A protein has these predicted regions:
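...captures the hydrophobic TM-helix bundle architecture rather than a specific catalytic motif
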Residues: 1-196
Length: 196
């Protein structure tokens, strides 16, 4: 075919079923959920990148007083890593049509994520008890802002997790929940990467 013909094609006007009943659709197809998650992750990446740039820029000022790092943050990081592993177990179970693998992975991922969020609240309480308020220092404000936004995204992930878990609990087949488990796992891994 000529280059001009290819460039002036309007695939949205072409009948998707061609000669002999063969479907003429693109070779690349993504479910709407995957497209939506990818667009959302791009937006979240931009937000976290801009905050990281602002954080790094603000660190250069003379009045920057860094906060101490409580040991609980390391425990929370471990909880988040193991939660991501549990979500991967659920995803592997979904890909292998193993409902017990999906169930075990989802249960552990949910429990560990709630433990992570509880640990974050505990860290905040520790910081406040030590006098590290958000309004006393820019470093403190950045700490609270970044951990709050990350925590809100984790809580939002728990909403999606709950939808997958409740569908599984009500007896949905692995095939019915496979996509939602895959999307949750991608989201969990992404938030773990942001946290690290």
């Amino acid at each position: 075919m000529s280059l001009f013909h290819e460039m002036t094609k309007k695939p949205w006007l072409v009948d998707p079923v061609g000669a002999e009943g063969v479907q003429e659709v693109g070779a690349f197809f993504l479910p709407h959920g995957k497209v939506g998650l990818r667009v959302f992750l791009v937006v979240v990446t931009v937000i976290f990148t801009l905050m990281t740039i602002a954080y790094a820029d603000r660190m250069l000022f003379a009045n920057w007083l860094p906060m101490p790092e409580p040991w609980v943050l390391w425990l929370n990081t471990a909880l988040l890593i193991v939660s991501g592993i549990a979500m991967q177990v659920a995803r592997n179970g979904a890909q292998q049509d193993n409902i017990s693998g999906v169930r075990d992975g989802l249960v552990w991922a949910g429990v560990l994520t709630v433990a992570f969020l509880t640990g974050q609240l505990y860290v905040w309480q520790q910081m406040v008890d030590l006098g590290y308020y958000a309004n006393t220092n820019t470093a403190n404000a950045f700490f609270y802002l970044l951990t709050a936004i990350h925590g809100l995204h984790m809580a939002g992930g728990l909403v999606a997790w709950w939808r997958s878990f409740s569908r599984m609990w009500r007896g949905a087949s692995v095939t019915d929940i496979r996509l939602s488990v895959e999307l949750c796992t991608t989201y969990w891994h992404y938030l773990l990467l942001i946290w690290l």
